[in-house]
Amino acid sequence: MVLTAGDKANVKTVWSKVGSHLEEYGSETLERLFVVYPSTKTYFPHFDLHHDSPQVRAHGKKVLSALGEAVNHIDDIPGALSKLSDLHAQNLRVDPVNFKLLNLCFVVVSGTHHPTILTPEVHVSLDKFLSAVATALTSKYR
């Protein structure tokens, strides 16, 4: 899916609200992922997965920082996430479906904190953007 100028503007509007809460929203996104989709916990056997765990908070911040890179390079998401794609495909071997699950959780967290900006149109734009991110992250899988 191609992101239109309107989609890009909508994504940047969401990010203007989310970008200053990377650790908080990132950890909430991961906590939701682990509760709603418990099979995703298998990738984090060395983490304390309890609420407000420092490991989950740090990784949540890392995840949303990567999303921020995609927002900052919205015209070249594959290029911005190339190294991360290599890491997930070759070293971590994360099942690609998990990126979609994470995206769903991120939309819920974003909408919970900022319900007025997550209009249906913005939701569509965010879904398209997150789909492009997931596609970029899975581009190195064989």
Swiss-Prot record:
<comment type="subunit">
    <text>Tetramer of alpha-1, alpha-2 and two identical beta chains.</text>
</comment>
<dbReference type="GO" id="GO:0020037">
    <property type="term" value="F:heme binding"/>
</dbReference>
<dbReference type="GO" id="GO:0005344">
    <property type="term" value="F:oxygen carrier activity"/>
</dbReference>
<dbReference type="GO" id="GO:0042744">
    <property type="term" value="P:hydrogen peroxide catabolic process"/>
</dbReference>
<keyword id="KW-0479">Metal-binding</keyword>
<dbReference type="GO" id="GO:0043177">
    <property type="term" value="F:organic acid binding"/>
</dbReference>
<dbReference type="InterPro" id="IPR000971">
    <property type="entry name" value="Globin"/>
</dbReference>
<dbReference type="InterPro" id="IPR012292">
    <property type="entry name" value="Globin/Proto"/>
</dbReference>
<dbReference type="InterPro" id="IPR002338">
    <property type="entry name" value="Hemoglobin_a-typ"/>
</dbReference>
<keyword id="KW-0408">Iron</keyword>
<dbReference type="InterPro" id="IPR002339">
    <property type="entry name" value="Hemoglobin_pi"/>
</dbReference>
<dbReference type="Pfam" id="PF00042">
    <property type="entry name" value="Globin"/>
</dbReference>
<keyword id="KW-0813">Transport</keyword>
<dbReference type="GO" id="GO:0004601">
    <property type="term" value="F:peroxidase activity"/>
</dbReference>
<comment type="similarity">
    <text>Belongs to the globin family.</text>
</comment>
<dbReference type="InterPro" id="IPR009050">
    <property type="entry name" value="Globin-like_sf"/>
</dbReference>
<comment type="function">
    <text>Involved in oxygen transport from the lung to the various peripheral tissues.</text>
</comment>
<feature type="binding site" description="proximal binding residue">
    <location>
        <position position="88"/>
    </location>
    <ligand>
        <name>heme b</name>
    </ligand>
</feature>
<dbReference type="GO" id="GO:0019825">
    <property type="term" value="F:oxygen binding"/>
</dbReference>
<dbReference type="GO" id="GO:0005506">
    <property type="term" value="F:iron ion binding"/>
</dbReference>
<keyword id="KW-0561">Oxygen transport</keyword>
<dbReference type="GO" id="GO:0031720">
    <property type="term" value="F:haptoglobin binding"/>
</dbReference>
<dbReference type="GO" id="GO:0072562">
    <property type="term" value="C:blood microparticle"/>
</dbReference>
<feature type="binding site">
    <location>
        <position position="59"/>
    </location>
    <ligand>
        <name>O2</name>
    </ligand>
</feature>
<feature type="domain" description="Globin">
    <location>
        <begin position="2"/>
        <end position="142"/>
    </location>
</feature>
<dbReference type="GO" id="GO:0005833">
    <property type="term" value="C:hemoglobin complex"/>
</dbReference>
<keyword id="KW-0349">Heme</keyword>
<protein>
    <recommendedName>
        <fullName>Hemoglobin A subunit alpha-1</fullName>
    </recommendedName>
</protein>
<dbReference type="InterPro" id="IPR050056">
    <property type="entry name" value="Hemoglobin_oxygen_transport"/>
</dbReference>
<dbReference type="GO" id="GO:0031838">
    <property type="term" value="C:haptoglobin-hemoglobin complex"/>
</dbReference>
